[in-house]
């Protein structure tokens, strides 16, 4: 009886180990590298004036109250208005460089923003892999 019990515990442990290792491999396979098109889509929300949607892309705001998210959207709107006054607004934006972290779960993006007054700047956006998709940090 005791041998049967030990054999049962061993078998259950083996099955549990197999299930947990298979699950982590599945998650690894699902993560895709960040692509330029996704960065441009997210920055396009800002560029088009959809500040609430831009803030919704921020993983850091997921658990924030709605009032905080509204403040963040208002801050981005104010920043865009300043860009409009000083530089005529954003004409275009393009990805210069994607730098993934060692584990691939975070990517720093250098984005070149061209303004209507013929000036430009390079900005850094940080993206993180959260819940099976890329989000602004």
Where are these regions (language model features)?
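Bacterial N-terminal signal peptides
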Residues: 7-16
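Short, low-complexity N-terminal intrinsically disordered segments enriched in polar/charged residues
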Residues: 19-48
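Exposed beta-sheet edge and beta->alpha loop/turn motif
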Residues: 92-137
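Short solvent-exposed beta->alpha transition segments
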Residues: 36-40, 52-102
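Short, compositionally biased low-complexity segments
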Residues: 6, 46-51
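Positively charged n-region of N-terminal signal peptides that target proteins for export
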Residues: 1-4
């Amino acid at each position: 009886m005791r041998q049967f019990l030990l054999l049962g515990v061993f078998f259950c442990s083996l099955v549990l180990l197999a299930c947990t290792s298979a699950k982590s491999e599945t998650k690894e396979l699902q993560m895709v590298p960040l692509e330029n098109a996704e960065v441009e889509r997210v920055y396009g929300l800002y560029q088009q004036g959809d500040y609430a949607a831009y803030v919704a892309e921020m993983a850091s705001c997921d658990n924030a109250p709605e009032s905080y998210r509204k403040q963040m959207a208002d801050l981005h709107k104010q920043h865009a208005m300043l860009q409009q006054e000083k530089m005529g607004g954003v004409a275009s934006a393009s990805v210069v460089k994607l730098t993934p972290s060692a584990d691939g779960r975070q990517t720093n993006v250098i984005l070149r923003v061209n303004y209507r007054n013929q000036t430009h700047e390079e900005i850094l956006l940080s993206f993180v892999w959260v819940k099976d998709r890329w989000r602004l940090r």
